[in-house]
Amino acid sequence: MKYFDIMSLECKKIGIEFTEEKYGKFMRYKELLQEWNKVMNLTSIVDDEEIVKKHFIDSIKIFECEHIVKAKRIIDVGTGAGFPGLPIAIMNDDIEVVLLDSLQKRVNFLNEVIKELNLKNISTVHGRAEDFGVDKDYREKFDVAVSRAVANMAVLSEFCLPFARVGGYLVALKGPGINDEISTAKKAIKVLGGTLDKVINVEFENEDFQHNLVVIKKQNGTPKKYPRKAGKVSKNPII
């Protein structure tokens, strides 16, 4: 129960319940992450405490956005090792979560975690956002699209906004100093049917790093020509 108190405190601050059962799932997730990371590149963060703070708590902080709390269906685009999608599913089993990633090895890892943690409200999809963003079973079918991927906001918006329903949201987990990136992405956000809703500054107790939650509201349907085919989104962003 070494990290229970710190995780419980951070959850209490944002008004969500943290239990010993949830803690146990996070600790098993940590063990699997460390185990699989020895044979494939899942994360550069391998220390117990760093995983808890920079992966688990960082992901849980997304609940500071009320649209996450209210959501019934969320897709995590480019989920990697499962952040923030898996922690969202662990914290709230009323939310249906879909994890999308382009690398089969990572999807295999995610499936193992889901099985080990006996999570019933989460599934994985192997593929690219550019392909599934035009698939009628996924396009505009989610209350919220989330991503902690490293792409800039213009690129991330084209990857993610097609998944959000009209009236839904994109919530991107970004680092500090986000204003210039948002300004550059304004055209892309508008073209794709979105508008900037707000930026939530996320602070961490006794830590020198901070993050921002960039919240984009989907006001209009995304034009049919977006997302563009694989490769074009990153090479030629809408700016």
Curated annotation (Swiss-Prot):
Residues annotated to bind S-adenosyl-L-methionine? 78, 83, 129-130, 148
GO MF terms here are: rRNA (guanine-N7-)-methyltransferase activity
Query: Please, which domain of life does this record's source organism belong to?
Result: Bacteria
Which principal EC class is assigned to this enzyme?
transferase
Q: What is its main location?
A: cytoplasm
A GO cellular component entry from the record: cytosol
Concerning SUPFAM superfamilies, the annotation shows: S-adenosyl-L-methionine-dependent methyltransferases (SSF53335)
- A Pfam family per the record: GidB
Q: InterPro entries this protein is in? A: rRNA_ssu_MeTfrase_G, SAM-dependent_MTases_sf
E.C. number, please? Answer: 2.1.1.-
> According to its UniProt record, where is this protein located?
Cytoplasm
- Keywords from the UniProt entry: Cytoplasm, Methyltransferase, rRNA processing, S-adenosyl-L-methionine, Transferase
Q: Which family does it belong to?
A: Belongs to the methyltransferase superfamily. RNA methyltransferase RsmG family.
What is the annotated role of this protein in its UniProt record?
A: Specifically methylates the N7 position of a guanine in 16S rRNA.
What is the name of the protein in this document? Ribosomal RNA small subunit methyltransferase G
Organism name:
Clostridium acetobutylicum (strain ATCC 824 / DSM 792 / JCM 1419 / IAM 19013 / LMG 5710 / NBRC 13948 / NRRL B-527 / VKM B-1787 / 2291 / W)
